[in-house]
């Protein structure tokens, strides 16, 4: 037997957590995610968005959303751009670990849509220009995973 999630979002409730740091990028990711959800049938009133200060704060609010029982999936969006210090490495590692563990802890798909880039240009490319919009891609993944995970509910 083959299990797959379908890409029809009708009836799904989705939470989105967005880091405000680098908002000129994260707002584009959010726009892409909202577009992706709506294009696939998720109603606007079935989408909740929570803004947090930065990427490091994303896992806590994503966990609270996932544990609330209100959502079929949670999308995390943020942008971490390498600077001159090791701060980038710590933030990227902790956010990735934190978000990755949430699906396993909560049984709710939590999608990692956090950009971790070397340059501002790379982030811009992934927020709706050359390399597509990772927010949109995260929305599609959330819909697919929500349906796929329900097959074992």
UniProtKB/Swiss-Prot annotation:
GO terms for biological process: riboflavin biosynthetic process. It catalyses: (2S)-2-hydroxy-3-oxobutyl phosphate + 5-amino-6-(D-ribitylamino)uracil = 6,7-dimethyl-8-(1-D-ribityl)lumazine + phosphate + 2 H2O + H(+). InterPro entries: LS, LS/RS, LS/RS_sf. One of its GO terms (cellular component) is cytosol. Keywords: Riboflavin biosynthesis, Transferase. Gene3D superfamilies: Lumazine/riboflavin synthase (3.40.50.960). 5-amino-6-(D-ribitylamino)uracil binds at residues 21, 55-57, 79-81, 112. Its EC number is 2.5.1.78. Pfam families: DMRL_synthase. The keyword tRNA processing does not apply. Disulfide bonds: none annotated. GO terms for molecular function: 6,7-dimethyl-8-ribityllumazine synthase activity. The keyword Transferase applies. The active site is at 87 (proton donor). Belongs to the DMRL synthase family. Catalyzes the formation of 6,7-dimethyl-8-ribityllumazine by condensation of 5-amino-6-(D-ribitylamino)uracil with 3,4-dihydroxy-2-butanone 4-phosphate. This is the penultimate step in the biosynthesis of riboflavin. NCBIfam families: lumazine-synth, PRK00061.1-4. Forms an icosahedral capsid composed of 60 subunits, arranged as a dodecamer of pentamers. This is 6,7-dimethyl-8-ribityllumazine synthase. The lineage of its organism: Bacteria, Bacillati, Bacillota, Bacilli, Bacillales. The gene is ribH.
């Amino acid at each position: 037997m083959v299990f797959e999630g379908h890409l029809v979002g009708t009836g799904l409730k989705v939470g989105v957590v967005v880091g405000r740091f680098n908002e000129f990028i994260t707002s584009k990711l959010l726009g892409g995610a909202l577009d992706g959800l709506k294009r696939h049938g998720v109603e606007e009133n079935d989408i909740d968005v929570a803004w947090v200060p930065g990427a490091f704060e994303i896992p806590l609010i994503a966990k609270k959303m996932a544990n609330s029982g209100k959502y079929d999936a949670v999308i995390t969006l943020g942008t971490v751009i390498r600077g001159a210090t090791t701060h980038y490495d710590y933030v990227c590692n902790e956010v990735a670990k934190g978000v990755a563990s949430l699906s396993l802890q909560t049984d709710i798909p939590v999608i990692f849509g956090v950009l971790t880039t070397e340059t501002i240009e790379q982030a811009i490319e992934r927020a709706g220009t050359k390399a597509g919009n990772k927010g949109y891609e995260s929305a599609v993944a959330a819909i697919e995973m929500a349906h796929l995970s329900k097959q074992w509910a």
